[in-house]
């Protein structure tokens, strides 16, 4: 109970599905302007998350699809990055610019930053175009960066339920989108175990 009061005071909400959330709204877009003249503006989020260390085993930072100061803050605070890319032309084209930003943040601000992989999302396998984009991304980046085997399928209903404050697991736990995220979770956990095994081996 004491911990719940502590996190509530920080604007963190406990969701019935078993996770804590710090939700944002449209007002967050104004932070881009506010951060322009802020001291250590690239690491403000990291400084805040440092105060939460020990309370959580994992913290996920969901970024808006832009390369502004908020995204830079997220990259400066993170140790791993999963890059979601819609199976469409423009998002795929913008991937190279995002990768350049990630590498720049790694060089200048956060040397521990690593890319876990690229995740294909909103994939409509009924169209040849989506299949071609997916194949192109795997061919272009697969030799340098892991492209997750999991693909998150397109779902109109998945978009709608986010407005209801529910997750896909609460709405349709046996559906294709939920199955996709379950498979992604397994891939990420496997990566974590491989890293842990590698660290243990290097210590020995």
Language model region names:
Residues 1-4, 8-204:
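P-loop NTP-binding core
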């Amino acid at each position: 109970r004491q911990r719940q009061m502590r996190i509530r005071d920080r604007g963190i909400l406990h969701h019935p599905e078993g996770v804590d959330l710090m939700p944002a709204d449209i007002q967050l877009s104004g932070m881009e302007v506010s951060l322009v003249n802020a001291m250590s503006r690239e690491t403000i989020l990291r400084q805040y998350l440092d105060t939460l260390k020990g309370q959580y085993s994992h913290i996920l930072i969901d970024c808006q699809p832009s390369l502004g100061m908020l995204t830079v803050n997220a990259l400066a605070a993170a140790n791993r990055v999963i890059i979601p890319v819609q199976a469409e032309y423009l998002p795929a084209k913008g991937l190279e610019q995002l990768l350049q930003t990630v590498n720049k943040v790694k060089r200048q601000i956060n040397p521990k930053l690593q890319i876990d992989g690229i995740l294909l999302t909103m994939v409509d396998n009924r169209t040849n175009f989506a299949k071609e984009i997916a194949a192109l991304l795997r061919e272009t980046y697969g030799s340098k960066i892991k492209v997750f085997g999991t693909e998150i399928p397109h779902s109109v209903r998945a978009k709608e339920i986010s407005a209801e404050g529910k997750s896909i697991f609460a709405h349709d736990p046996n559906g294709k989108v939920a199955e996709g995220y379950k498979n992604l979770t397994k891939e990420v956990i496997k990566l974590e175990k491989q890293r842990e095994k590698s660290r243990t081996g290097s210590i020995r």
